[in-house]
Amino acid sequence: MHSHLGIKYPAAAATAVVARVGLVLLGASAPAEAQYRIRNLVSNQVHQAPNIDPLLANAWGLARGPTAPWWISDNDTGWSTIYDAAGKQQSLRVLIPTAGNGPASPTGVNGPGTPTGIVYNGSSTDFQVQGWSSVFIFATLDGTISAWSPGLNANQATLAVDNSAKKAMYTGLAITSNPSGNFLYAADNTNNAIDMFDGNFNLVKSFGDPNIPSNFSVFGIQDINGLVYVAYAIPNVGAGGFIDVFTEGGTFVKTLIQGQLLNQAWGMAAAPGNFGPLSNTLLVSNNSVNGTINAFDPTTGKFVGTIKDESGKVIVLNNLWGIAFGGGNSTNGAINELFVTVGQGIGAAELAGTFASIVFDDEGGPK
């Protein structure tokens, strides 16, 4: 078992591995769903991908700007490493500070943090740090939120929120994308609440769903089309969970999905209209030993299907984390190309990390 601040991640049995990055193919399906292809882009393990980066350990969250490359939260090394859609590593890499690394210790003297969720900030006025605009914002298991401002410090994010004293453990991060007056949402797994911050990093309120069983905690979070989706899971247990929908003001709307198809659900993404039979669905990644990506009707929550390979077998990725689509350019990929991060591996490779992409193969690859 590998753990971070109380969250334990079980190692898979050696027999579960039949392909790279812990890829497992299970079961058969109708031909209509058997048309997706996965491609490893970067790994910190040799022979796993064409590009190798030792810092890509327990790759967790991922984010991009409209034309910017992909930024990855490397949870086990405390860095954010950056890659284009082909997996080519960019020269810049950014250290994520841990609790206590404020303005008095700007060089990270307390060591690196444990980044989880990451978001792109498109506002030049919201979420400034020390008067400088920030571009990417990170949450950590240490209970901190840091922002990267190239004008302030190009090589390290700057601490903006430190809630380590209240034992906060932020497992996910979401942001609004309005012209102004934006909010940031951090999923506090320990205190089972969503901390909502304004554009000055001030806490507005904490919210959640009091009707969720008490053994479930907030885990993943995503702002999609003006609504905040929150995934609840039972820490260290496995199958079963909930996905709630809230307004951007933190008002509960409904429980959209619940049941055994959610297994440590964390990543969420809205599929575009050209993603094959799973087009226009809500995709949800399961961060389990046998992690899958399931698709649901975004309005009713009805199960639609699971991403499967060309032969009709379910694509399974051990300890799957983030999922997000490209922006429609060569830097961060096609709008129907799904990029994923895979975290901990198995056995001796518990600190593995992989950045990969999935395309609907019937269309001849990404468009």
What do these predicted ranges mean?
Residues A14-G27:
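Bacterial N-terminal signal peptides
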